[in-house]
């Protein structure tokens, strides 16, 4: 079984983990309702790009 030859330092470990942070979701303002929603998703009222996808 492979065993590390040297202990990984805190600096080396943290440098490796710099890209693991969370990113905020891409929100855009809906032109019809004015609400914020995620891009490329159906709005809460069931429309997408001005067309009704889901009728309530």
From Swiss-Prot:
<feature type="region of interest" description="Disordered">
    <location>
        <begin position="1"/>
        <end position="56"/>
    </location>
</feature>
<feature type="compositionally biased region" description="Basic and acidic residues">
    <location>
        <begin position="29"/>
        <end position="38"/>
    </location>
</feature>
<keyword id="KW-0687">Ribonucleoprotein</keyword>
<dbReference type="GO" id="GO:0006412">
    <property type="term" value="P:translation"/>
</dbReference>
<keyword id="KW-0689">Ribosomal protein</keyword>
<dbReference type="GO" id="GO:0015934">
    <property type="term" value="C:large ribosomal subunit"/>
</dbReference>
<dbReference type="InterPro" id="IPR002677">
    <property type="entry name" value="Ribosomal_bL32"/>
</dbReference>
<dbReference type="InterPro" id="IPR044957">
    <property type="entry name" value="Ribosomal_bL32_bact"/>
</dbReference>
<feature type="compositionally biased region" description="Basic residues">
    <location>
        <begin position="7"/>
        <end position="20"/>
    </location>
</feature>
<dbReference type="InterPro" id="IPR011332">
    <property type="entry name" value="Ribosomal_zn-bd"/>
</dbReference>
<comment type="similarity">
    <text>Belongs to the bacterial ribosomal protein bL32 family.</text>
</comment>
<dbReference type="GO" id="GO:0003735">
    <property type="term" value="F:structural constituent of ribosome"/>
</dbReference>
<dbReference type="Pfam" id="PF01783">
    <property type="entry name" value="Ribosomal_L32p"/>
</dbReference>
<protein>
    <recommendedName>
        <fullName>Large ribosomal subunit protein bL32A</fullName>
    </recommendedName>
</protein>
